[in-house]
Amino acid sequence: MSELNKIALEIINNGKGILAADESTGTMTKRLESVNVPSTSENRLLFRETLFSSSSMKECIGGVILYDETIKQTSSKKNKIPDLISSMGSYPGIKVDTGAKVLAGSPNEKITEGLDGLRERLKEYYSFGARFTKWRGVYNISKDYPSKLSIQSNAHALARYSILVQECGM
């Protein structure tokens, strides 16, 4: 069995799931400020460290999707965040797209960006401990959408993403 297959099966073993903890700094700021906590790098780290240290992690979570800021952070106990996640029996993952933008030629639809420089980012993320990735494909669904342009554009982006990710061992 390939390493990628092994990881995929272990992430969902015994009914475990994936924790999406890839909130951007902006989203984390909104969450923390809603409870009157300043959104500093330290407070965002403490929030995530508490989440990743929970006793429920080992029982329920097989993989954790991280944000660029988080995968590079070190916990208060001087452990790298991906190492903390691994110590709890989960695989660290990383969100690698850079957002959805308006699709040229179809202003009511989106295309996911982030392919430029992806190979280099993937190698870096792998060295930090990431073993799987997340990429969003955004489609409007209605009687008029998705358009052929959107389907083809997003399929092409997803195919390029998939090849690069597998090439880098994730």
Predicted regions and their residues:
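Helix-rich catalytic cores of soluble enzyme domains
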Residues: 118-170
